[in-house]
Amino acid sequence: MKNSVNNFQVSGFAIKDVETKQFGNMTLGKFAVSISRTEKDKEGKDVRKSCILNFDAWRKNENASTLDCIKKGELITVEGYFSPDEYEKDGEKRQVSRHICTKVYSTPDKDEPGKEE
């Protein structure tokens, strides 16, 4: 597989509309998606586990409309890569992993989102 390292694809629900900000000829879209899955607990009961992932999507201004599908409550699929980043806070270096979105699109509803078949 070509370029199979450091890629992701997740589907979930946008928790709010995308927030955009222009920088010269580029637009930054920031958004978050709630993802979940069903797992079995120790007693064998189904338990829903979920978390929120934050994403950054850079687009040329003329392509910023590709982010229009990111509306609160919409089921979307996000593809991209992880980008390591460093910053300093209170004199201490910190590291984070950013989720960089390269593609985002509406996803058809499933009968049971997050449930593996």
Which positions does each model-derived feature cover?
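Single-stranded nucleic acid-binding surfaces, predominantly the OB-fold ssDNA-binding core
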Residues: 1-117
